[in-house]
Design a protein with these regions (language model features):
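Substrate-binding/active-site clefts of carbohydrate-active enzymes
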Residues: 138, 142-192, 199-323, 327-328, ...
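Hydrophobic faces of well-ordered beta-strands that scaffold small-molecule active sites
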Residues: 137-139, 194-196, 240-242, 334, ...
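A structural motif
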Residues: 191, 331, 380, 460-461
């Protein structure tokens, strides 16, 4: 009985539809043969002895340690008390309720306060997802490397297209016009959602070091070009998701340059996490590494000072940006970079702004680990599901785990979240942050197809990294950004 577990008002008990709850129970693997839900209205317990009415629960999946049981249940008056009748293979029969495990005897069944509760089916608290997100096939574009549609905006020193494998500071001239020119190609692929890496003004080729969040990078086009891109996407039934880098800014932003110039007297001094003035660092072995940094940064990159999202001025600034691109350009989704290093307090405000701006907006967080805290319905709809797809790659491609272990890991991830979340989790096999799938598969295109087919059949929505469809290869960043 020590493995028996349930937690009310969580992924174990949640409103799935306005009048239906999903209730889950965890037990030790291959220990329990039969589970029933005892449930009824909390105000009629003594009147009707409703605990004598039992609903069968179904074992839905297993991990290497646990079995998971589930049932869908409604309630006439939209409130529910419930407990569990559990029978093990060795003949033990127990009642499990809010106070723990008891013998399955009348005196314990009549303990009103020993039942879990869903006090009321609050529609406002139900985890809602955009319906369109469940049917989306995403295509990730690294704008600087997808297609050069307008050579007139090429940055200085641009290299001939495809002339060499990229270094960290190379430019090849990809832009938004290049995407517009290939939208029909994407439609032919079956794509109906584009996830763009950052397109805002920045110093680097990857644009994660933002200078101005309200301007398209001039090497990619301008705001009018982007507006036309969104309109052309929507004509073709393609949703548009932008990448928001709200954990940090670039060190050539006017805010950070003011801090460098004016130190603690800068009006932006509290916009960042600065531990000592003047701001300084010692260069490391490469452009993106440093040590003895006097301010907090992304990783150890001195060129990406971390934003202080506890500062109300910073919050207002970032929330204005979130609303601006939705209202002015009609984007459909935000992908949030380094989302786990920004406060929950801020993300809750961000979610409210997005919901107010557009009814069916989708929010995706970049989180590489288990993400329950962010997926309670008041922050994100989904995360980049690396924890899920890592298991697939470890089994199919790297041959590091058994099939049984892969299934266990996949099922464990599914049971961390509500059904709604699982329907829109972002199943991504490779990206601008990882080696290319074909490279991991050692050039075996048949294996690559098998992995993609298996992944695309799982719960969640697939994302294809640009160029994978033509067999593009590449090791870790920057090689994966050809």
């Amino acid at each position: 009985t020590t493995a028996i577990y349930h937690r009310p008002e969580s992924e174990f008990a949640y409103l799935y539809e306005k009048d239906k709850m999903h209730i889950r129970l965890r037990t030790a693997r291959q220990d329990v043969r039969h589970v029933q839900l005892l449930c009824g209205d909390p105000y009629t317990l003594y009147k009707e002895a409703w605990y004598q009415q039992r609903i069968e629960m179904k074992k839905i999946l297993s991990t290497d340690l646990h079995d998971y049981w589930q049932v869908s249940v409604g309630a006439e008056f939209r409130r529910l008390s419930y407990g569990f009748s559990i029978e093990s293979y060795d003949g033990l029969h127990v009642f499990y309720g809010d106070h723990g495990v008891y013998p399955f005897e009348q005196q314990y069944l009549e303990m009103n306060n020993n039942y879990f509760r869903m006090p009321y089916f609050q529609e406002a608290d139900r985890f809602k997802i955009p319906e369109w997100a469940k049917e989306t096939v995403w295509y990730q574009i690294f704008p600087e490397r997808f297609a050069n549609g307008d050579p007139s905006n090429d940055p200085e020193g641009v290299l001939p297209w495809g002339s060499k494998n990229p270094d960290r500071q190379d430019f090849f001239g990809g832009d938004l016009q290049g995407v517009i020119d290939h939208l029909d190609y994407l439609v032919d692929l079956g794509i109906n959602g584009i996830y763009f890496c950052p397109i805002f003004e920045a110093y680097s080729n990857h644009k994660y070091d933002t200078i101005d969040y309200l301007a398209i990078d001039p090497a990619f086009g301008d705001n009018d070009t982007f507006k036309r891109l969104v309109e052309e996407c929507h004509k073709r039934g393609i949703k548009v998701m932008l990448d928001a880098v709200f954990n940090h800014m670039g060190d050539t932003s006017h805010q950070w340059l003011d801090v460098i110039k004016n130190g603690k007297d800068s009006p932006f001094a509290d916009w960042f996490h600065i531990n000592e003035f003047p701001v300084n660092y010692k260069e490391g072995e490469n452009f993106e590494d440093a040590y003895d940094i006097t301010y907090d940064v992304f990783a150890f990159t001195p060129h990406m000072p971390k934003l202080n999202t506890e500062n109300p001025d910073v919050q207002d600034y970032l929330l204005k940006i979130a609303r601006y691109w939705i209202e002015e350009f009609d984007i459909d989704a935000w992908r949030l970079d380094v989302a786990n290093e920004v406060s929950h307090h801020f993300w809750k405000k961000f979610r409210q702004v997005c919901d107010d701006a557009k009814d069916d907006f989708y929010i995706l967080g970049e989180i590489w680990h288990s993400s329950q805290r962010w997926l309670q319905g008041d922050e994100f709809h989904a995360v980049m599901n690396y924890a899920f797809t890592d298991a697939i790659i470890e089994y199919f491609v790297k041959d590091e785990i058994s099939m049984t272990k892969m299934v266990s890991e996949l099922n464990n991830q599914l049971m961390l979240y509500r059904e709604q979340t699982n329907q829109v989790q972002f199943n991504i096999l490779d990206s601008h942050d990882t080696p290319r799938l074909l490279t991991l598969a050692r050039g075996d295109k048949d294996l690559m197809r098998q992995v993609m087919a298996f992944t695309y059949l799982q719960q969640g929505v697939p994302c294809l990294y640009y160029g994978d469809e033509i067999g593009l290869t590449g090791d870790m960043d920057p090689d994966c950004r050809k």
